[in-house]
A protein has these predicted regions:
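Alpha/beta enzyme core
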Residues: 2-6
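Glycine-centered short loops/turns at secondary-structure junctions
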Residues: 7, 61, 244-246
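Active-site or pore-adjacent capping/gating segments
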Residues: 13-23, 31-134, 212, 250
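Catalytic core of the metallo-beta-lactamase
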Residues: 28
Length: 295
C-alpha cells in the first residue's frame, strides 16, 4: 500500500496460492484487492512460470505472463473464438501495459539509444547510493587486532573474486555498470603495497605481512547450494591460515557459510555480502581503517 502511494509503476504477483487460487491468476487478488481496494493502476506481471490457466489469467486483471506461456494448454485466440473471453478482456489486459510504457517514455526512445540523457545524468547519484549501501552492510565477524592495517603494511591478495564481481544467479544476476573489481579497489587504496597471486605457494603466504583471501558463494533462487565453500576456496583458506596467522578472509555471499576449521585461525573475517558495483571500494577502506564495518 505504501509502495502504491509512492507511485510504484509495476507489481509482480507471487508464487503461492491465496484463498485457494494461484496469486498470479487470481481475480480476487489482482482486480478486487490490488486494483480495486488499493487503487493500483499500473502494470501487473507474474513471477516466472507461476500461472497455469490462461482463461483465469486473462480474467484476473493480470497484464503480462513471464517469461511467456508455459503450462496453459489453450491460447488467448482460442479462448476468444470459443466465447470464453471477449476483446474487452484483452483490451483491459493490454491497457495498463501500454500506459506504463508511455509513462516511462519507452516509445520515445530511439532504437539505438541505451540510456536517455536524463537517466545518464543520474548515474553518479546511483553509484553513490550503491557505495553507501555496501559501506553500511559490511560485517566484521572477527578481528584479532589485525584491522585496520597499519600504514606501510604489504598485502598478498588471492582468491575467487579478484577480477569478478560476485553476484547471485537467477533474478539476482544483475551485471550493473562501472563495476570496480577487488583488484582495482585494492590497487586504488594501497598502490604498490598489494601484490596478487593466482596460486600462492606456502612460502609466499608465510612471507607476506598480511594475506587477504577472497572467497564466497554464488547463491540462486530455487537452488540449495552446499553450506560449505567451494572445495577450491576452502582449500585456499586452509592453506593461507595454516601458513600465516595474519590472514584476513573476505567472504562475499548472499547467505551463511560453514567456517568450521578456519574461523578461529584467521586473524580477521569480513563479510561483504554481494558488493555490487562499488562495494569493493568500501571493503578496501575498511581494511585501511577509513571506514567502520557497521553492518
Amino acid at each position: 500500500e505504501a509502495g502504491i502511494a509512492a507511485g510504484v509503476a509495476c507489481v509482480m504477483t507471487s508464487y503461492n496460492r491465496i484463498n485457494g487460487e494461484w496469486a498470479g491468476q487470481s481475480k480476487e487478488v489482482i482486480t478486487d484487492l490490488l486494483r480495486g481496494e488499493l487503487g493500483f493502476e499500473g502494470l501487473v506481471m507474474t513471477d516466472w512460470n507461476s500461472v497455469y490457466d490462461m482463461q483465469k489469467l486473462i480474467l484476473s486483471g493480470q497484464n503480462v505472463e513471464m517469461p511467456g506461456s508455459w503450462k496453459e494448454d489453450i491460447t488467448a485466440q482460442e479462448l476468444l473464438s470459443q466465447g470464453k473471453i471477449t476483446e474487452a478482456d484483452i483490451d483491459a489486459m493490454i491497457r495498463p501495459l501500454i500506459a506504463t510504457c508511455i509513462r516511462f517514455g519507452l516509445y520515445d526512445r530511439k532504437g539505438d539509444e541505451k540510456y536517455k540523457p536524463e537517466l545518464l545524468a543520474k548515474l553518479p547519484e546511483h553509484e553513490a547510493a550503491a557505495y553507501r549501501t555496501s559501506s553500511e552492510g559490511i560485517v566484521l565477524l572477527r578481528n584479532d587486532g589485525l584491522l585496520p592495517l597499519k600504514p606501510g603494511t604489504k598485502i598478498l591478495a588471492a582468491g575467487q573474486f579478484l577480477d569478478e564481481i560476485p553476484r547471485g544467479a537467477g533474478s539476482a544476476a544483475v551485471k550493473g555498470y562501472n563495476n570496480v573489481t577487488l583488484r582495482q579497489a585494492l590497487e586504488e587504496q594501497f598502490g604498490a603495497r598489494v601484490t596478487f597471486a593466482e596460486k600462492p605457494s606456502k612460502e609466499q603466504f608465510a612471507a607476506a605481512d598480511v594475506v587477504l583471501i577472497s572467497v564466497g558463494t554464488l547463491d540462486a533462487e530455487s537452488i540449495e547450494r552446499p553450506f560449505a565453500l567451494p572445495s577450491s576456496a576452502e582449500k585456499l583458506v586452509q592453506q593461507a591460515v595454516g601458513a600465516n596467522p595474519r590472514t584476513v578472509v573476505l567472504v562475499n555471499s548472499g547467505s551463511g557459510i560453514r567456517m568450521t576449521g578456519w574461523a578461529d585461525k584467521a586473524a580477521a573475517i569480513l563479510y561483504g555480502w554481494y558488493p555490487g558495483q562499488n562495494g569493493f571500494r568500501a571493503i578496501a577502506k575498511v581494511l585501511a581503517g577509513e571506514l567502520n564495518p557497521s553492518g
